[in-house]
Structure formats: C-alpha cells, structure tokens
Amino acid sequence: VKQLKTRPANYLLRLTHHPTIPSPLTLFCLREAATASTTYPLTSPTMTTVLTPQIDSLQTSLEAKGVKYALASYVDIHGMCKAKMVPIAHLGQMMTGSELFTGAALDGVPQDVSDEEVAAMPDANSATVLPWNPEVAWFASDLYLEGRPFEACCRGILKQMLAKATDMGFTFNLGIETEFFILKENLDGSFGPVSDRDSLDKPCYDLPGLLDNYPWITEIVDYMNQLGWDVYSFDHEDANGQFETDFAYSDALTMADRLTFFRLMVKEVARKYGYFASFMPKPFANRTGSGAHYNMSLADVNSGQNLFENPNDPLSCKLSNLGYQFIAGVLRHAKAICAVTCPTVNSYKRLLRQGSMSGFTWAPVYICYGNNNRTNMLRIPLAGGRVECRAADISTNLYLGAAMILAAGLEGIREGLDPGEPHTENMYNYSLEDLKAMNIDMLPRTLQEAIDTFEADPLSKTVMGPLMYQTYIDFRRQEWEDYHTHISDWELKRYLKFF
C-alpha cells in the first residue's frame, strides 16, 4: 500500500497481473490506490485484466486462424520494431498493458536504469497476422508510463498531431513509395545484387533483373495484398539490387504502422531466401539511394473528400489553395523536417545532384516545389490532388516524420502562407549564385547541419515535446560525433602516403 500511494500505476499493474496474488488482495489494492493522494491518476486502461467483448472477439478470431502467439510491438528512435511475445491465451492481459519494457535498454528511449518500465498498449485495429508465420499476430502499440501516455512514444507523438488536424477538420492521408535493396553476401565477405545479370549502369525498370528476383519479390507482394494493402505496381529501381513497391495510401497512422511492418516483413522474407534486405539510404556511393517519398493530402474529416484537389488550378498543378498553403508551411520548416525524414549520417550522401552511374540521383537538393518535376523537394504529380515530399529516405521513422511534416503544413494553412510560383525547370542546372538570387536555399548537407536547424526551429519542440526533442538532438549529435571521429578508408587511401 505504501508503494501504491507513491507510484501506483506500474506497481498495481504487476499486482493485477500476478498469478499468485489472491483476488481479495487485488481488490484491496485497487481500493487503496483509488483513495491515495498521488500525482499519478489511475486513469490508464492498463488497470484491468477484464476481457472486453472486443478483445474476447478478437482472441476468438485469431485462434480460429491458428494464431498461437501475439506480439506487443512498438518502435525505438530509429523506427525499428521492439516487442514481447505472449501466448494467445493471455491476449486480454497484453491488450491492457501487461507487457513492460525497460526503456534504458533501447536506443533513444529517454529513461534511466532506475526508472519505472514503460507499458505497451496494443492497438486492436492494427492486428496483423504474420503472412510468413501465421501462428503469430503483430500489434502496433503505444507506450504508457505511470498510467499516462509516455511523452517520448513515437506513435503517440504522431497521434497527438493527427488529433490537431482533426480539430481543424482534416484527415491526413499518406502514401509511401518503398525503395530498398535486396543483396547477397559473397564468400569473401563482400555483398552485391542477387542476380549476376543485374549489372547495368542504368538498371531502372530492367526486366531480366526483375525476373531473376521473381520468387522473393512476388512473395512479398502477395503478402501485402493478402493484408489488404493493394499493391498496384512494383519494379527494379535505379540501382543494382534495388527495388520499389507501390501500394494504396491510407490515413497516416495506418501507413506508419504499415511501413514499420513492411520493413520487418521484407527482412524476414529475404532471410528465408538466403539474402538480406537493406533500408540504408545509400549503400553504394556510385548508385542511386533509396527514398521513401511521402505522398500527402488532406481530406475532409466528415466526408472524406480530398481537399487538395482543384482541376481548375490557375497554376496548372491541379492543386487547391489549401494544398499550396500546406506546401508553404513545409518549405518554411524544410531543414528541421529533413532532420527527421533523413535521419542518418548516410542520408545526406543521397541528397546530391551527382553520385550515380545512371546519370542522376533523382534526389532533391534545394528547398523548392513544382509540378511533375523530380528535381524539386516537393513535387505535385501530374494528376494533382496530392503533394510528394522527395526529401525523405527509407530509414525514416515515419511516426516522427509524418508528425513533423503535418505540423508544418497545418501551420501554413493557419497562417495562409503562399509558396510562390511552382518551378517547372530542371533545378539541377542552376548555380548557387542563381539560387541565391531566386531566394532558394539548399537542404542540409550533413546530419550535423540538419540537427542544428532542427534544434533552432520552435516547431520541433512543439511537435516532439520537450523530452523527445532533447533526446532526438542528443542522440543524433552523438551519431554525428561517432562518424566524425572515425577514420575512413577514403582518408587513409588519400592521405596516409601522400603526406
């Protein structure tokens, strides 16, 4: 009882889920905690193990499909899955927060070893049976601490921003173009494409390269369609061993859950075939990097109507005034956004005009927008009605990236910002002097520069909250320092015998 009166939430959670504590004691603890004077209100749904009809129905449905285990999964600062596995008979407990995690054991979770554990609260709507292992179901989860939403939960940060969009009457819809590498490791420790024929300087849309990878890529596509994601296209991309899948957009939270699951699924399928999947932004200096272009629109929260559509757009982009205001907000905060949508040291080796044997990197370099023109940071595709952010790579933590870019876009709408005229020309052809005269700035050149602008932009703390804001800065700065103090092979080759 003494512990309950000081820190009841997680302690009570342990009691109510403890198999050896008699029911009367559990009830006594509940009564004492309810009357205790505490700064931790007992409002969390983690305080009960009662199976609601929804959870009971879900468990029955999963058991009928042959599911034996469930995963309470969440992401760390990288957007990588972390989880505990629970027998399906204990699904009710898992769904009410029984699975606790020590945050100090993870990257970018701001907790000390002496802190209380965070509890994973699974979202029943995210239940996904693993297509490659149908005995297991995966659940995206929010993190709770002391009975309250954990401030540094990536999924929770996105949900808070989506709630603000809802208050303004909007649903944020999002589609992601998933680019990635599937590679094999050779006996000498080197790695390269699966197919020996995948060696062209311009391998984009290469049919032999696609057909040689038919078994694993069609297995992934079949799984995606089995899950209801509606894949409408997939192809060999512009680098050897690189591929892209395109599937239907959804609301932003669902898409963030799906991208998280997608990366897990692709890695598992590739491993089955003896290969490995890489979501590193640019693994080869002379090849195109892997993007994760954000295709964005706002819909009316009640009718679902796309509010970015305007077939009579005087600027000929088929975009509404609301869409242009959204663009202006994103451009205003582009550098800070880049620190999250391009989160690694390696990310900035993708954001170059040159650096691919195919002739182009296809990546943005400047903070500008335009029509169906891939040299802009923000592109409005030919059909209009949506905005594509090209300054995002496949290593992105989509929960955080979507939250940042949505916040910027909503600011543009609230303030009625104007992005100016769209750029239809090849932006790669301009010199720095030309761009300066046009008042067009460059995207960050390094992670250090991106984090500096992220730290200086007030929007970052507003979106992330003070705890995650500082954690993100500290973590990425340390990543930069680790890289900056490393002596590379390039340096040794260039300088060791030269001086």
Protein language model features and the residues they cover:
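Cationic, low-complexity basic patches in intrinsically disordered or flexible, solvent-exposed regions
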Residues: Q3-L4
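Intrinsic-disorder-associated, low-complexity terminal segments enriched in Asp/Asn/His/Tyr and depleted
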Residues: N10-Y11, H17-H18, Y40
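ATP/Mg2+-dependent ligation/transfer catalytic cores
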Residues: S44-S233, S250, M255-F261, Y275, ...
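Catalytic-core signal marking the mid-to-C-terminal active-site face
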Residues: D56, F261, E268-R271, Y275-A277, ...
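Short glycine/proline-enriched loop/turn "hinge" motifs that connect secondary-structure elements
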Residues: T128-E135, T171-N173, F234-A239, R287, ...
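Histidine-centered divalent-metal-coordination microenvironment in nucleic-acid enzymes
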Residues: E179-F191, H236, N240-S250, M280-G304
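Short, contiguous, pocket-lining structural segments
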Residues: P208-W216, S233-A239, D251-F262, V266, ...
